[in-house]
Amino acid sequence: MEFKLEAHRIVSISLGKIYNSRVQRGGIKLHKNLLVSLVLRSARQVYLSDPCPGLYLAGPAGTPAVPPPQQPGEPVAGPPSGWGEPPPPVARAAWPEPEPQPQPQPQRPSVCHTPGAGSSEPVAAVAGSGEALRGGEEDSAAAAWGRVERPRAASSGGGSDACPEGPRAVRRPCGCPPAVEERSSEDGSPAPPAPCPRKRGAAGVGGGRASCSAPGSTPLKKPRRNSEEQPVTGEDDTDEEMETGNVANLISIFGSSFSGLLRKSPAGGREEEEAEEGGPEAAEPGQICCDKPVLRDMSPWSTAIVAF
């Protein structure tokens, strides 16, 4: 009984801290999780430490009995040990399959026959496979290099100015006319900014046209940030108000449930006095001092705490 009273005092103190943290700005965000965890731990201690839980609720007696059979069953489970056996036959079945494939090809038989021969042969097989892979890579590299050189030879045959046109064509992804850029490069004057959406941001940063710098300039983003920050502050205030309301609801729920548990015990006189003493600390006395039908309705919350 003394342990229960101490647990009730701890719960009342924690709920009182939650209720009083509304005065502090941001106090709920910093301490709400810790205090709620403390409340739940104390609640579990009250239920699990009870020698005869059948007097209060039938739920607590069943919940702690469920996990013990599961814990010894987990290490005894055989899926991990069973997984080690099937892989060897699967690997053995996979090796003979590629054997009929290398018959027309003279390069692969050395690689496929090695797994069944011995420990020294796989080393030579690995070396042969590495050489074959290197030869394949060289062939693919030569083919790719030939593909790259073909357009270069075609462009070099067209004229000396064909090579610089390559990067120019790359720089014109938006379909800009090439004549304007060529003329500007020949005259030596800087090329005017093209009407491409990609170059608008660069022109705005470098101080180009006013029409291009307007959408990408930073001063327009600052008022947006300010306008976004204003509603965010309002949302924070509303969140704090909602959190305070939730804290009040938590106080009413936990306070009524614990007061009901203590009143159901045989020595109800002393515990009712303790509940009335812890009432003003936790919340308003009207929320904790509830009628019997209300306490009956709040019994699911006590089972929820045990399940938690």
Swiss-Prot record:
Main location: nucleus
Biological processes, Gene Ontology terms: cellular response to heat; positive regulation of cellular response to heat; positive regulation of transcription by RNA polymerase II; regulation of cell population proliferation
Start-end of Low complexity biased regions: 73-84
Keyword terms, alphabetized: Activator, Cytoplasm, Nucleus, Repressor, Stress response, Transcription, Transcription regulation
Up-regulation conditions: By serum and growth factors.
Gene Ontology terms for molecular function: identical protein binding
Keyword Nucleus (UniProt): yes
Bias-annotated ranges (Pro residues): 97-107
Keyword Cytoplasm attached: yes
Acidic residues compositional bias, start-end: 234-243
GO cellular component: cytoplasm; nucleolus; nucleoplasm; nucleus; protein phosphatase type 2A complex
Localization in the cell: Nucleus; Cytoplasm
Similarity comment: family membership: Belongs to the IER family.
Subunit structure: Monomer. Homodimer. Associates with the catalytic subunit of protein phosphatase PP2A. Interacts (via N- and C-terminal regions) with PPP2R2B. Interacts with PPP2R2A, PPP2R2C and PPP2R2D. Interacts (via N-terminus) with RPS6KB1. Interacts (via central region) with HSF1; this interaction promotes PPP2CA-induced HSF1 dephosphorylation, leading to enhanced HSF1 transcriptional activity.
Function (record text): Plays a role as a transcription factor. Mediates positive transcriptional regulation of several chaperone gene during the heat shock response in a HSF1-dependent manner. Mediates negative transcriptional regulation of CDC25B expression. Plays a role in the dephosphorylation of the heat shock factor HSF1 and ribosomal protein S6 kinase (S6K) by the protein phosphatase PP2A. Involved in the regulation of cell proliferation and resistance to thermal stress. Involved in the cell cycle checkpoint and survival in response to ionizing radiation. Associates with chromatin to the CDC25B promoter.
Protein name, as recorded: Immediate early response gene 5 protein
Organism of this sequence: Mus musculus
Gene: Ier5
